[in-house]
Amino acid sequence: MQNKIDHKNIKTIGLVTRPNVSLDKEILKLQSILSIYKVELVLFKESSEILDLPKYGLDDLFKISDFVISLGGDGTLISLCRKACEYDKAVLGIHAGHLGFLTDFKVDEAENFFQAFFQGEFRIEKPYLLSVFLEDKQGKILEKLAFNDVVISKNNQASMAHIEVFRKEKKFNEYFGDGLIVATPAGSTAYNLSANGPIVYTLAQAFILTPVCSHSLTQRPIVLPKGFEIEIMAKDCILCIDGQENYKMNDFKSIKVGLSDKNVALIHPKNRDYFQILKEKLHWGN
């Protein structure tokens, strides 16, 4: 993954917007700003039906772009981060709506950001993703990445989930309840937080197991280190990656999850303050 970005030689920047929302006005403003620096803005083909700008499929967009802008909310950025890992490209999150935990500023603030960016005034953070290995009954292994979390929940919401967790073939824990969240530090402020899981600093090399509505008062979230791989077994349950990809657990004989060696480069303003964002979003202090 990129350790730095050569801000002096940026030629092409890709842009992907939140789906099913017209952001043509915001796109044109970004194009106008980037043209000052002789940088071409290219679009994901589904980001605009009207604008006369170069458009590409997602894979081609990543191939030709020096980095990619996510214009939308945290959900838009999360899906892009998994793709960014494939192409070793960085992602910049600009929010179109409410401030997110991952998207730093609005389009109205983009001019100031890029003025600083092209002078080398920015920072790169590289949060780790989860690796998910799904082995089917024929022994074929499907490897997936999760930026935020992997959630195991009951297929039939009227019944209780029974989830067993193993490490090195020894039972590590057993959960009865509505489900189980396996979250990254970046995802600790998402569903994990709603389930009373801990907030873990984004760049920590760890992941979190958080039970959802456990039927036992003694079950509590636990933070596990990088290198600690778990195997999850549960019948009649659904495994969901980042709220976007669903798999029936009955279709697989083995599902293993752990913190990946892969991370994604996120571009931030130099003065970004993670704890100030927490304070604003969670209404800490005055």
From Swiss-Prot:
Extent of the signal sequence: none
Major subcellular location class: cytoplasm
List of residues binding NAD(+): D74, G75, N148, D149, D178, A186, T189, A190, Y191, N192, L193, S194, Q244
Cofactor: a divalent metal cation
GO biological process, one term: NAD metabolic process
Top-tier EC class: transferase
InterPro entries assigned: ATP-NAD_kinase_N, ATP-NAD_kinase_PpnK-typ_C, NAD/diacylglycerol_kinase_sf, NADK
Catalysis: reaction(s): NAD(+) + ATP = ADP + NADP(+) + H(+)
A Gene Ontology molecular function term of the record: metal ion binding
Localization: Cytoplasm
Keywords: ATP-binding, Cytoplasm, Kinase, NAD, NADP, Nucleotide-binding, Transferase
One Gene Ontology CC term in the entry: cytoplasm
Residues passing through the membrane, by range: none
Catalytic residues (positions): D74 (proton acceptor)
Entry coiled-coil feature ranges: none
EC assignment: 2.7.1.23
HAMAP family (UniProt xref): NAD_kinase (MF_00361)
Function in brief: Involved in the regulation of the intracellular balance of NAD and NADP, and is a key enzyme in the biosynthesis of NADP. Catalyzes specifically the phosphorylation on 2'-hydroxyl of the adenosine moiety of NAD to yield NADP.
Entry's family note: Belongs to the NAD kinase family.
Name of the protein in question: NAD kinase
Organism: Campylobacter jejuni subsp. jejuni serotype O:23/36 (strain 81-176)
Source species taxonomy: Bacteria, Pseudomonadati, Campylobacterota, Epsilonproteobacteria, Campylobacterales
